[in-house]
Amino acid sequence: MWGRSVLFAAAAGWMVAATVSATVIYSNNSPMNDSFTNPTGTNQGQAVGSSGWYYNNVRNNGVVGIQSTLPFAGNGSVYFQSPSGSAKADVEYLANGINLGGNYLAAGSLGAFADLESFSYSWYRDSGSTTASHLHPVLRVLLDADGNLLTTADRGGLVFERIYNGGSVAPTNTWVTDTIGPSTNLWNFGLGLGFAANINQTLYAYDATLADWQAYFPNAVILGFSAGVGSGWNNTFSGAVDAITWTINGQTSTYNFEVGPAGGEIPEPGTMVLTAAGLALLVRRVRN
């Protein structure tokens, strides 16, 4: 299953004239790099323009920003650095995000969790990273378990990691694409269950699939999506993410992160149109 990206599997059959659009999110400092950090232990965030994306949950000198350091199918991506096990940094799309004490929370929903068909991203681990070899930037779907946005104790999310889906050592110095579908294993934080709850009563708490979680939380709504690094990642990590995509009730949203168009005026957000040839470049990735 790791041989190909499910998201773009149809690309090979497309004619050159076929196109697919992605919303382009530019750095706040476009055409320069962003580098948001926070030295304290209290989560802090920053809006990425008015795009609905946020640098979020940044603490203990974690770093996140749209940069040209590790470009993906363009001139940028979302770059992360974690200098220690206490550091953390995320980039998040939040439904009607609001600032609460310097960090951002969702005040709305993107739709029913039951209608989430898939989500995906591309990620990169730099070979200079000294944290555990299986670690890579993770992708999360953020949820309100009972669907009532006025009760917040049941908020949390589900996390994708390759190590719980047949992976072992994360590839380095190359872009990797992963797609999360109904049979993909996810583990939880929060949602009124604590950490890594064993909802399917197996001997292992990390083998509940997306479909299992949807059955367990039939009333849940989606608050947003999150990619990031830390905490608990001892030693150092550097890497990036891009091409974050989700499909909810048949509607697909794809986001590409760039520092800015070459020599052009920057719309906000922009729209990138990929030909089939460009799409082939976008998905020429290593899959284990």
What residue spans do the PLM features occupy?
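C-terminal cell-surface anchoring/sorting signal
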Residues: M1-T19, G270-N288
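Short carbohydrate-recognition loop motifs
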Residues: N60-E92
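Short beta-strand segments enriched in hydrophobic/aromatic residues
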Residues: S82, W123-R125, L143-A145, V229-S231, ...
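A short beta-strand element within beta-rich, extracytoplasmic domains
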Residues: D115-S127
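Extracellular ligand-binding interfaces
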Residues: Y124-Y204
